């Protein structure tokens, strides 16, 4: 108790000495020519933190009903602006995109130097960010690169179908999310390193379990509200231990990638080495020779690979699992999708990337999953690099900007019956998710749009098609299971709280 009293007194003293003058100044800014966006009145010290209960995106959406689609909040010492409409998202991400092109960096990322070289956190006008962005766009996610790796994706889809068929033949229930995670991880590691890290059958494999735990924990802890972000004066103490936890999981992923790099560097020195058609060789070529790019350091390559691993395996697998949840909960939608796939594929078992444009109901289903279960409900928080006027309000420099995409997906003024899963809403509509239709921006928009969108989109369509075309499904647990299927856990990616367990039946 004595320690708690001392800590509380120290906290109050620090606030009045360091924070109160800034807080008072920001309050005085409300007035002609410098009015901040409307928002709930903040309390001393904590600001609006106590008004945020439960998942942040849901709390923000509720407050926006009162204060509007451009809302200001005081989260401790942090000034934040929450955007909750396509019109305001257009202002922030497109019309004034340069002013909001930097990421808001959480304290927990300030470890292992990740904040300095990650493509997710580097300033958008930095040489490093432009270099990494260009390499990813031209060497990994370009149309030509995706065409060259189509065979790898088809092989991973065949392995997925074979794995599910094994459960079907044995009449066993399977963890669908675990299978989709393994598929995406297998694809990512094949693309990066020409290896198969995971094994569908080895559910107790140390590599399988540890790798998935590192990735899932990393994305989970990033989404945890952190007192070190609200009150940076306490950041050195890491009071919730979030930086320490992320450091452990991030460090393990970095160590694994470093071992891959060191092994490849040794192999490349041998006179008998045969070049591999993977991304690591491409990055090392650039590091050693330039090839028209600025040189990449080994540190940049290491962190770049970790960024790809986390984004490529976790969010895509989670979105595929959500798609299967909704299709199993809506047998009529599943029947429509299966009929379209049967008509187009015939006796073929797999969809190719070039087939997607010819399957309108499959496309509509994936769009509706993006709307109904956005992987990143707040997208990637931005930071204002300069003071900017938006819709008559002042957005101060260094303000944290959060685009509440989840709120837009539940807005009845945008979507009819927003709480219903209806792929049909997209049929015959010219709405895509590539960053120009701001009512549907699961990958973001502008300079910070997710560079892996082309690959993620192809795999999502193809995995869902593989699972639905080749198998019927029975959900485990009956009515009780159905009630729990939509429960989620907030984080960098919106994960299912309970895994989807279902029995596949060979068609």
Curated annotation (Swiss-Prot):
Topology relative to the membrane: Single-pass membrane protein
A biological-process GO annotation: terpenoid biosynthetic process
Residues reported to bind heme: 450
Tissue-specific expression: Expressed in glandular trichomes of young leaves.
Catalytic activity: 11-hydroxyferruginol + 3 reduced [NADPH--hemoprotein reductase] + 3 O2 = carnosate + 3 oxidized [NADPH--hemoprotein reductase] + 4 H2O + 4 H(+); miltiradiene + 2 reduced [NADPH--hemoprotein reductase] + 2 O2 = miltiradien-20-al + 2 oxidized [NADPH--hemoprotein reductase] + 3 H2O + 2 H(+); ferruginol + 3 reduced [NADPH--hemoprotein reductase] + 3 O2 = pisiferate + 3 oxidized [NADPH--hemoprotein reductase] + 4 H2O + 4 H(+)
E.C. code: 1.14.14.61, 1.14.14.-
Enzyme class: oxidoreductase
Subcellular location: Membrane
Cofactor or coenzyme needed: heme
GO MF term (any one): iron ion binding
TM region positions: 6-23
Pfam families: p450
Keyword annotations from UniProtKB, A to Z: Heme, Iron, Membrane, Metal-binding, Monooxygenase, Oxidoreductase, Transmembrane, Transmembrane helix
Gene Ontology cellular component list: membrane
Function: Monooxygenase involved in the biosynthesis of carnosate, a potent antioxidant labdane-related diterpene natural product. Catalyzes the oxidation of 11-hydroxyferruginol to produce carnosate. Mediates the conversion of miltiradien into miltiradien-20-al. Also involved in the production of pisiferic acid and derivative products from ferruginol.
PANTHER family membership: CYTOCHROME P450, FAMILY 76, SUBFAMILY C, POLYPEPTIDE 5-RELATED, GERANIOL 8-HYDROXYLASE-LIKE
Family: Belongs to the cytochrome P450 family.
Name of the featured protein: Carnosic acid synthase
Organism this protein belongs to: Rosmarinus officinalis
């Amino acid at each position: 108790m004595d320690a708690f009293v001392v800590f509380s007194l120290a906290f109050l003293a620090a606030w009045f000495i360091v924070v109160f003058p800034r807080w008072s100044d920001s309050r005085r800014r409300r007035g002609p020519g410098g009015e901040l966006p409307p928002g709930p009145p903040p309390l001393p010290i904590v600001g609006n933190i106590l008004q945020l209960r439960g998942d942040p995106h849901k709390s923000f959406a509720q407050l926006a009903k009162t204060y509007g689609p451009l809302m200001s909040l005081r989260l401790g010492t942090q000034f934040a602006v929450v955007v909750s409409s396509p019109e305001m998202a257009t202002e922030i991400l497109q019309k004034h995109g340069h002013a909001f092109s930097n990421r808001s960096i959480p304290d927990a990322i300030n470890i292992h130097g990740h904040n300095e070289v990650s493509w997710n956190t580097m300033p958008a006008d930095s040489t490093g960010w432009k270099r990494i962005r260009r390499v990813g766009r031209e060497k990994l996610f370009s149309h030509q690169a995706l065409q060259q790796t189509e065979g790898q994706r088809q092989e991973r889809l065949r392995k997925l179908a074979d794995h599910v068929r094994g459960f079907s033949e044995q009449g066993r229930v399977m963890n669908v999310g675990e299978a989709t995670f393994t598929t995406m991880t297998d694809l990512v590691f094949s693309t990066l390193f020409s290896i198969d890290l995971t094994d569908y059958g080895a559910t107790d494999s140390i590599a399988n379990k540890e790798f998935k735990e590192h990735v899932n924990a990393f994305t989970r802890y990033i989404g945890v509200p952190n007192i070190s972000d609200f009150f940076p004066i306490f950041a050195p103490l890491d009071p919730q231990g979030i930086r320490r936890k992320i450091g452990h999981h991030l460090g393990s992923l970095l160590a694994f990638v470093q071992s891959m790099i060191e092994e490849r560097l040794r192999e490349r020195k041998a006179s008998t080495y045969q070049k591999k058609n993977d991304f690591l060789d491409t990055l090392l070529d650039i590091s050693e020779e330039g090839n028209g790019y600025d040189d990449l350091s080994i540190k940049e390559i290491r962190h770049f690979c970790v960024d790809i691993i986390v984004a490529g395996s976790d969010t895509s697998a989670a979105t595929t699992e959500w798609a299967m949840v909704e299709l199993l909960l809506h047998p009529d939608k599943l029947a429509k999708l299966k009929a379209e796939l049967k008509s187009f594929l015939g006796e073929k078992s797999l969809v190719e990337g070039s087939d997607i444009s010819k399957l309108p109901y499959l496309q509509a289903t994936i769009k509706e999953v993006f709307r109904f279960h956005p992987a990143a409900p707040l997208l990637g928080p931005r930071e204002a690099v300069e003071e900017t006027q938006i819709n008559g309000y002042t957005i101060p420099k260094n303000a944290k900007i959060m685009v509440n995409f989840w709120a837009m997906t539940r807005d009845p003024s945008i979507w009819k019956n927003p709480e219903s899963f209806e792929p049909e809403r997209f049929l015959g509509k010219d709405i895509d998710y590539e960053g120009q239709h701001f009512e549907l921006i699961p990958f973001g928009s502008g300079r910070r749009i997710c560079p892996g969108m082309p690959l993620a989109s192809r795999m999502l369509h193809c995995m869902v098609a593989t699972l639905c075309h080749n198998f019927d499904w029975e959900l485990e647990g009956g009515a009780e299971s159905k009630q729990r299927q939509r429960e989620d856990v907030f984080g960098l990616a919106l994960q299912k709280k309970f895994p989807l367990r279902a029995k596949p039946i060979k068609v």
